[in-house]
């Protein structure tokens, strides 16, 4: 069976102001299955943002588990992330899931992987998915050379990624925290 390909997710932070955005395209082989998928969510009483890339069903499973860990740890982002990735790495079923998550609150941005990685990226930005490298490059240039707010940087980065990556479209969802 062919793999679902999707997406571009990018997160930009300036201090405690953070924006997380993603495109809406889901592709199966060379066919666009959906152009309006929502891959960005607000979690834990709207205090945490989460975005996912990878196999859609796998990503939803991981996001649900992350949300349960957030509830268990009263919204403590780092503890929830470490516990999720520990489970993800050691559980035989979870280990097969093919997805990545970016999660953020007003203090931290984290990238979570199935290898058990909990990465806090440098430069106040992170990007994942098929268009992630394009979006990250664009965001880094804008972060270094402009005073644009995070949501404007995320928007422009997603536009650039959508122009370059066939698995990324121009239908964006952007959520913010702080200000």
Curated annotation (Swiss-Prot):
The keyword Cytoplasm applies. Its EC number is 3.4.25.2. The keyword Metal-binding applies. GO terms for cellular component: HslUV protease complex; proteasome core complex. The active site is at residue 7. Keywords: Allosteric enzyme, Cytoplasm, Hydrolase, Metal-binding, Protease, Sodium, Threonine protease. GO terms for molecular function: metal ion binding; threonine-type endopeptidase activity. Allosterically activated by HslU binding. PROSITE patterns: PROTEASOME_BETA_2. GO terms for biological process: proteolysis involved in protein catabolic process. InterPro entries: ATP-dep_Prtase_HsIV_su (IPR022281), Ntn_hydrolases_N (IPR029055), Proteasome_sua/b (IPR001353), Proteasome_suB-type (IPR023333). It catalyses: ATP-dependent cleavage of peptide bonds with broad specificity. Pfam families: Proteasome. Na(+) binds at residues 162, 165, 168. It is found in: Cytoplasm. Protease subunit of a proteasome-like degradation complex believed to be a general protein degrading machinery. NCBIfam families: ATP_dep_HslV, PRK05456.1. A double ring-shaped homohexamer of HslV is capped on each side by a ring-shaped HslU homohexamer. The assembly of the HslU/HslV complex is dependent on binding of ATP. Belongs to the peptidase T1B family. HslV subfamily. This is ATP-dependent protease subunit HslV. It comes from Bordetella parapertussis (strain 12822 / ATCC BAA-587 / NCTC 13253).
């Amino acid at each position: 069976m062919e793999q679902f390909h999707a997406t571009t997710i990018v997160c930009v932070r300036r201090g405690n102001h953070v924006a997380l955005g993603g495109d809406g395209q889901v592709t199966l082989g060379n066919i666009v299955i959906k152009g309006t998928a929502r891959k960005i969510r607000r979690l834990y009483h709207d205090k945490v943002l989460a975005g996912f890339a990878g196999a859609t069903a796998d990503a939803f499973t991981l996001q649900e588990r992350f949300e349960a860990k957030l509830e268990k740890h009263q919204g403590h982002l780092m503890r929830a992330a470490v516990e999720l990735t520990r489970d993800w790495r050691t559980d035989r079923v979870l280990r097969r899931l093919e997805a990545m998550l970016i999660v953020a609150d007003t203090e931290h941005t984290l990238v979570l992987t199935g290898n058990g990685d909990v990465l806090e990226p440098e430069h106040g930005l992170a990007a994942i998915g098929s268009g992630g490298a394009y979006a990250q490059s664009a965001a880094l240039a804008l972060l270094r050379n402009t005073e644009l707010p995070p949501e404007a940087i995320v928007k422009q980065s997603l536009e650039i990624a959508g122009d370059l990556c066939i698995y990324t479209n121009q239908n964006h969802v952007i959520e913010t925290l702080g200000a």
